[in-house]
Amino acid sequence: MDNKNWSDRASASGIVGKSLSEFICDDVTRMYVATMIESVRVIPHTSFRPYRCDTPDMKRFMQMIITPEDNGWIRISHELLRIEPLEKPVTFSTVTEFSPLRQCKNNQTIHFVRCSICNRLQRYGNRDNTWYEADSLIARSHALSESLKVIYGVCLDCLDKLR
């Protein structure tokens, strides 16, 4: 899709003019993105940040480019670097009704924490900082008949890259 078509679709969908934070579903990722943007504001430089934006059957390796503008604004653009097929398709369902006590309000079972940056998964409640690629984790378990229920966060590897 070219930039003109994307701009038209984004405008028609009400995306343009909204705060970036409205599209981020968890506090940790929201703070991560705010820190990236603020670092470019404080020390004007272009920052290149790799991330993943997968589909159910493809790993999409992307790069976010954060650039300060002369007028004080920040330009954020995205570039697709490469695509790889997943070994097995996997879908996710975001659990959004989540209390501070880590219990779902609507009785959904949370399976994993999904890193918003690299898309790796950590079993929910696991404290050993082991994160897995979705397709390798699924390949070792049964075939999935439903979406994996996840909450989002940022793994320590991705947090370390922010420094």
Locations of the language-model features?
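Sensory/regulatory domains in signal-transduction proteins
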Residues: 1-94
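PAS-family sensory modules
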Residues: 38-42, 69-163
